[in-house]
A protein has these predicted regions:
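Intrinsically disordered, low-complexity Ser/Thr/Pro-rich tracts
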Residues: 1, 5, 37, 41-43, ...
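N-terminal Sec-pathway targeting helices
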Residues: 1-18
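Hydrophobic alpha-helical membrane-insertion segments, chiefly the h-region
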Residues: 17-28
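C-terminal domain-boundary segment and adjacent tail
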Residues: 26, 31-35, 44-46, 69, ...
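Extended, non-globular alpha-helical segments
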Residues: 35-40, 64, 231
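Active-site beta->alpha N-cap acidic-glycine motif
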Residues: 41-172, 275-277
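Catalytic domains of cell-wall/extracellular-matrix polysaccharide-remodeling enzymes
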Residues: 135-241, 245-261, 267-268, 274-277
């Protein structure tokens, strides 16, 4: 039953994303259930596809700016939970391949000595985005105020190294549809946080391809590569979840093959900010 449900959901995503190509650039909205990753651990990006801005969002008498259209096939490589001792190897692989990525960063205190790597990543043209200061579900999901306090602390800790005022993208720990947060903040905590994020001008970013590099067992580089290929399937618009934490060094080893595979399939590499607009 679980396998059948997974295939049905993936089919729905493929259909909806295919239809979405007929629309202008817009936002992914978080509404999809978990696909391809462990429940309560990882969540996919939702399946709404591209939509045009609502007429009410365009001031009367003005001509809205038209952002560049994304390529027909694009992929965003995203990395959570860094910087760490793994990050230099990830940056080396990306830079060698001339690929730009998006890093959803943490500042837990344990990785303080690696925070200067954020300046290196930003200087190389990679996108820096918010993840969490603590990444402790029991702390950040106690209440909306607790979440925003955590984000403010993250911003403060990374401010010496990157331009934090311009960061308008974030990724909720566990994804925007995680259910583990209900243990601490109640059933409606994520809906409330998503609404508040939009009100504050943030775009929350999930994913539809999971490398499964942080689900336990320390998977090999070849396993991570196969996971990415399998999860991509026939999709043509992909946000790939990977990690550059201290325990996911094999992710860096898998990157050259992952990048080459996407290139062979005709994908263009993009930063998240190039394909998903802010509210």
């Amino acid at each position: 039953m679980k396998v059948q449900k997974k295939f049905l959901l993936q089919g729905a995503i493929l259909l909806f994303l295919g239809l979405g190509l007929g629309f202008g650039l817009g936002s992914f909205y978080a509404s999809a259930p978990v696909i391809g990753c462990r429940e309560n651990d990882l969540t996919p990006i939702p399946d709404e596809g591209f939509i045009s801005p609502a007429a009410s969002e365009v001031p009367a008498g003005s001509v809205p700016e038209t952002p560049p259209a994304p390529p027909d096939k694009w992929v965003c490589l995203t990395f959570d939970d860094g910087p760490s001792k793994t990050t230099p190897d990830v940056l080396a692989a990306l830079n060698a391949a001339e690929v730009k990525a998006t890093f959803f960063v943490v500042a837990t205190g344990y990785n303080e000595k690696y925070l200067p790597l954020l300046a290196e990543a930003e200087a190389a043209g990679h996108q820096i985005a918010f993840h969490s200061a603590s990444h402790e579900y029991s702390d950040i999901y106690r209440s909306p105020d607790a979440y925003w306090q955590d984000l403010a602390l993250l911003k403060e800790r990374i401010a010496p190294y990157v331009h934090t005022e311009g960061i308008r993208y974030l990724r909720f720990p566990g994804g925007s549809t995680n259910t583990v947060s209900r243990r601490y903040g109640g059933k409606g905590i994520m809906s409330e946080l998503k609404a508040q994020a939009a009100e504050k001008g943030f775009t929350s970013v999930d994913w539809n391809v999971c490398a499964e590099d942080a689900v336990g067992g320390k998977p090999s580089a070849s396993t991570i590569y196969r996971n990415v290929v399998r999860e991509t399937g026939e999709q043509t618009q992909c946000i790939v979840l990977m990690h550059d934490s201290a325990t996911t060094h094999t992710t860096a080893e898998a990157l050259p093959d992952i990048i080459q595979w996407y290139r062979d399939q005709g994908f263009t590499f993009c930063r998240v900010e190039q394909v998903l607009p802010t509210p």
